[in-house]
Amino acid sequence: MSSKLIRGTFILTLGTFISKFLGLFYVIPFDDLLKGHEEGASLYQYGYVPYTIFLTVATAGVPLAVSKFVSKYNAIGEYAVGRKLFKSGLVLMTLTGIVSFLIMYAFAPIFAEMTIKSDEQVISVAQVTTVIRAVSFALIIIPFMSLIRGFFQGHQSMGPTAVSQVIEQIVRITFLLGGIYVVLNILDGTVTTAISVATFAAFVGGLASLGALIWYWFKRKPHLDELLEEDRGNEEISLKAMYKEIIAYSIPFIFVGLANPLFQLVDQITFNTAMADIGNAKVSDHAFAVLNFYTHKLVIIPVSLATAFSMTLIPLITTSYTSGDRKTMRRNIDQTFQILLFLTVPAALGLALLAEPMYTLFYHSDPLGTSILRSYAPVAILFALFAVTAAILQGIDEQKFTIFSLLVGLLLKLVLNIPLIRLFETQGAVLATTIGYAVAILINLYVIKKYARYQFRLILRRTMFIGALNAAMAGVVLVLYGVLVKFLSPETGFQSIILVAICGGVGALVYFYLSLRSKLADKLFGDKISKIRSKLRIG
């Protein structure tokens, strides 16, 4: 791999990490600003779930596909092909963005009525309509902006994407938090106005990101024009042929990108109905916020970290499959699954074990939040497994099954959600998500087994071993936590920080030691870990 590509990948990974970090930790001041307005988080999420789905459909995976397309033709010196697609793509993304905005804005009352099912709820249809309309403006600009990122990435120029992502998050979060503070504390406005300003921040952040990308465009344009002059001109590809190739490539990414938002949408349109059926309409808005906003933000942490590591092996799977090297392909699949489980399982388990101080640390003490986080945390393993199995299917050119497995999982979620919520309240929604994702993953695993002729014997053995290491870690953490809570309260913020730092730190050290002692880490991460183990004189 060239040093330029390694540097670019590092820059992009760093930018993505900073962006995700900011996207997680803003919820601490966000929750603090909404004290006395607990319905604010629910209202925010009611607007954001439809927006995420509309945004995914509006972009249709085109920016990522353009990145691959431009890279492919640049590699053979056909620079004009990529530029032609870029110009056309900008027009297309502008049109799809505007159309998506108009549809979302016009149909906001219908989406709101699908969400709010009872007059006893704290939040009204009118409030949800206002918030959905406020966030819909971002659709005008984000697809257009995303395509420019894709074009730069296709030229192995990751800096513009990384910098624009960070700028977008900083501006969005600053506007979001500042807007809530000004509306509630200075203007003495309503929580609806405050949350409308908060969701409109997506548009403002998008503008800032676009500004950064335009600056990069003018800075890099002389170099890009030089490449055009070197164009070989051997390939004459029509826009129809280009988009045919792009659509074939992007459809699976659309569905994978939609997986989590669609599961959340099922909750949004069924949760309040089920809660009203069992007489819990008054608390359903708060329970929804705990489920789909507060705990979900925490559950996604281990997913983001683990998939970032394991996904780096996916291109190797694609290469070995394309070249017919099945032995290398199977070894890469082994490695992908093992790294995923090695990282995700302890993170999810730690989140479940320390659910009460973690929830208090990020938000405030809440028995419902603790309960939901404890049961929801292990689902992170399923989120990560679905993303990685879907990527492997893409690597072995069987991506059509990703769509099938997701639809089956969604159907199960839709069928089971209301009955399970009636039986177990908010926990029922977590259980329905677990079942839906588990079945979707089983389908993906079966397809991998059949078409990659992959045997899961090693993974099953390794999973049991990783489970044993985690059981040992959990035992130590539970004993330590039991002792510490006699002196520290997980219901207060500062003491929760101490609990999480000590228990989490000791748990991580125990797991790290056991993985070194057993030489599991050596097998997964190679010589560098072996050298560390030797220096520490472990094993």
Segments the model singles out, each with a brief description of its role:
Residues 119-147, 365-389:
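Alpha-helical transmembrane segments of multi-pass membrane proteins
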Residues 159, 173-216, 410-442, 449, ...:
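Membrane-interface helix-loop junctions in multi-pass transport and translocation proteins
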Residues 101-123, 185, 348-364:
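Short membrane-interface helical motifs at transmembrane helix boundaries
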Residues 141-164, 378-406, 423:
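Membrane-interface junctions at transmembrane-helix termini in multi-pass inner-membrane proteins
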